[in-house]
Amino acid sequence: MSINQQYVSGKSTEVRDVTIIGGGPTGIFAAVQCGMHHINCRIIDSMPSLGGQLTALYPEKHIYDVAGFPEVSAAGLIEQLWSQAARYKPEVVLGDKVVDVKKLDDGSFEVFTEKGHSYFSRAVLIAAGLGAFSPRKLPQLKDFEHLEETSIFYTVSSIDHFKDEKVVVVGGGDSALDWTIALLNVAEHVTLVHRMKEFQAHGKTVADAYEAQETGKLDIYLESEVASVLADSDRLTHAILKTPDEEITIEATRLLPLIGFRSNLGPIKNWGIEISGNGILVDNHMQTTVEGIYAAGDIAVYEGKLKLIQTGLSDAAMAVRHSLRYIKPGEKVKQQFSSQKASEKKA
């Protein structure tokens, strides 16, 4: 994804209407909403590129549950979202982490970054996903860390790493099942290992996995775990599985544990907003306990929350719309429609 350099800033003294903390799908769509409501914004993200987890961890993963896209890659979705946002020319600050947010006497906010920069805005929207995150690793493989990124992978940056390999996938959630299905067309053989009796993934994907098992394309071991591995020099050769009945050794040249992430809100906990678990408590307008600070996407906590890309986009729309009441008090907030914008341009 290319971002026109005119939008990228290292430091800017201009006061924006909204500072968006986080450049994942929720943050990018928040910029779209800002543009539609005729307010300007700045996106700040600690990563070197936009996209959050989608581009940092799973750029080639295919997504099937976003409305309007029967199938789209993670990187492709971010590309499309950015094409929407770019028309409004949001300022983008990459490679710098927000470490503090202070509310000023006039109700505006000063945002401080790790590199010593300060940014000012009239409202703040936190769309930081899981906060700081790292993949959960298998503790029994601590003596094989030298094989990580060559034979043992905890994320998939390129599916080519698994081409014509004997792959063992560990996990039972959506990521594990999605990648298992995707690898069937790439790897020499795929084995799926899950420590529980049932999978915790979408029913359709689970059905696809069992169908692949019936045709011999996939081996499935439930109530099982990878006890250890065997390696020849710097290459994985076998995985040792502990099953309900016995311990077995199978050929494996790639190991892909996909067992979730460890998340940490980090400095966000010290910003004076109410925290709930590993998220930020918000009301039905996506506003936090500090007036003028909003949260959207996976980091936002409210009753009935679903952690999906499309709900994150909805969160962003609600947050931006309500922020207008704070940014422009007394002005009537009008509902904006994309079709209305198109007709305005034609006129």
UniProtKB/Swiss-Prot annotation:
Key words of the record: FAD, Flavoprotein, NADP, Oxidoreductase
GO molecular function, one term: flavin adenine dinucleotide binding
Domain of life: Bacteria
SS bonds (residue pairs): none
Entry EC number(s): 1.18.1.2
Cofactor note: Binds 1 FAD per subunit.
Chemical reaction(s) catalysed: 2 reduced [2Fe-2S]-[ferredoxin] + NADP(+) + H(+) = 2 oxidized [2Fe-2S]-[ferredoxin] + NADPH
Residue sites binding FAD per the record: 26, 45, 53, 58, 98, 133, 298, 339
Listed cofactors: FAD
Gene3D superfamilies in alphabetical order: FAD/NAD(P)-binding domain
Assembly notes: Homodimer.
Family: Belongs to the ferredoxin--NADP reductase type 2 family.
Protein name: Ferredoxin--NADP reductase 1
Source organism: Chloroherpeton thalassium (strain ATCC 35110 / GB-78)
Taxonomic lineage of the native organism: Bacteria, Pseudomonadati, Chlorobiota, Chlorobiia, Chlorobiales
